[in-house]
Curated annotation (Swiss-Prot):
Main location group: other
Keyword Thylakoid: no
Protein name, as recorded: Flagellar hook protein FlgE
GO cellular component, one term: bacterial-type flagellum hook
Length: 405
């Protein structure tokens, strides 16, 4: 009977509306609505067709973005525009979600609330390779807990040397400036292959007009000649360095020290009496333990270590579908791919290949519009009541026909 089809269709409509309302606070939930179609019956005795009621052909999923709300939590992630987080369960089944509530398990895997693993690319602290999307795997931070030490291989030093210098002077190390316009000396901390910090002395001594000698010596209390090198510098009348500005520092103990270059690019000779070291740095550092990490918009996980160094320790990759409306909804606010949705396309990084970008410390709330759902509920309820009345009327007509006998 036609009225029964209306009752069934609107009952299903009410269930869809109720489910939307129930999930109005579910993170990453996408609202749904039915697609109604009218049914016809064909007569065998004529070319006419008669209405035969209504049905629901499919349920449409609304993948418009929900609003992002700040949480302040490092592992809360929202997606701006298109894309899904890719998850895998313990049996290897792949799912997709917009729910960005993640946690660290005891093995330091990034998981969702059901314990499924967030997938992407892993990297060690010594090597980063994010160019292979074929090897998506659960993101694990355990191997990134320690950043190995890096021995010093380059010292960068830029000094302004006073061309009026005639004799030695002392150095006030408190402000790194000379007490008198004479010879110059500074201490630089470097790191050996064991990650230990040691000081070396770099001094500049004037030989004659426009010519200087730079001396590099170890301050090792056991052997002050472990590092002991001298290099000649030549300047033109404008104070510009005309000789080599990069030198190789040699050591008596190659097992202890890396090959080190001394880069004096930018060092000049000038007439001013007040001299300072404009640049004074080196590229080594000690071993460090992971303190915090931050997830940036392109999905890179940046670790910060106790030695103040930062390192990319992982990469979250988002997946896209040609037809996301045809994804199969699963319990737990998940979806799985279908033939109609197409295969997932994984971007190299969030924000490229038309992929969405990540928003750290935020969550995407449900895109359910409660006002619309309440209006739809009233409409569905009236439709249901109207079809119920039609059913009663049809029933009376049938009873009347039966009683005519």
């Amino acid at each position: 009977m036609i009225a029964i089809s209306g009752l069934l269709a609107n009952n299903d409509y009410m269930e869809i509306i109720s489910n939307n309302i129930a999930n109005a606070s579910t993170i990453g939930y996408k609202s749904r609505k039915p697609l109604f179609f009218d049914m016809f019956s064909h007569s065998f005795y004529s070319n006419t067709t008669n209405g035969y009621g209504v049905g629901i052909s499919s349920i449409i999923q609304n993948f418009n973005n929900g609003m992002l709300v700040e949480t302040g939590r490092d592992l809360d992630l929202g997606i701006i525009k298109d894309g899904f987080f890719r998850l895998v369960d313990s049996q290897g089944h792949v799912y997709y979600t917009r729910d960005g509530q993640f946690f660290l398990d005891k093995d330091q895997n990034i998981i969702n609330i059901q314990g499924m693993y967030l997938t992407g690319l892993n990297t060690s602290c010594s090597k980063s390779d994010f160019n292979n999307r074929s090897n998506l795997e659960p993101i694990n931070l355990k191997n990134s807990n320690i950043l190995k030490n890096k021995p010093t291989s380059e010292i960068m030093l830029k000094a302004f040397l006073n061309r009026n210098t005639e004799s030695k002077s002392s150095v006030d190390n408190s402000d790194n400036k000379l007490s008198k316009p004479e010879d110059y000396m500074t201490y630089i901390s470097i790191y050996n292959k064991e990650g230990k910090k040691e000081d070396i002395t770099v001094s500049f001594n004037k030989k004659e007009t426009n010519k200087w000698t730079v001396n590099v010596e170890s301050n090792d209390s056991d052997d002050k000649e472990t590092i002991k090198n001298s290099f000649d510098l030549t300047f033109n009348d404008d104070g510009e360095l005309t000789s080599d500005n990069v030198f190789n520092i040699t050591s008596k103990d190659s097992k202890k020290y890396e090959n080190i270059t001394l880069n004096l690019t930018g060092t000049i000779e000038q007439s001013n009496s007040d001299v300072s070291w404009e640049e004074h740095s080196q590229n080594g550092y000690p071993q460090g333990n992971l303190k915090t990490f931050d997830i940036v918009t392109n999905g890179e996980i940046i670790g910060t270590y106790c030695n103040q160094k930062q390192q990319t320790i992982g990469q979250i990759l988002l997946s896209k579908f040609i037809n996301p409306e045809k994804l199969q909804p699963e319990s737990g606010n998940l979806w799985s791919a279908t033939a109609e949705s197409g295969e997932a396309k994984t971007a190299m990084k969030a924000g490229i290949q038309e992929s969405g970008v990540l928003s750290n410390k935020t969550l995407e709330v449900s895109n359910v519009d409660l006002n619309k759902e309440l209006i739809n509920m009233i409409i569905a309820q009236r439709n249901y009541q109207s079809n119920a009345q039609s059913f009663k009327t049809e029933d009376k007509i049938i009873n009347t026909l039966i009683n005519l006998q």
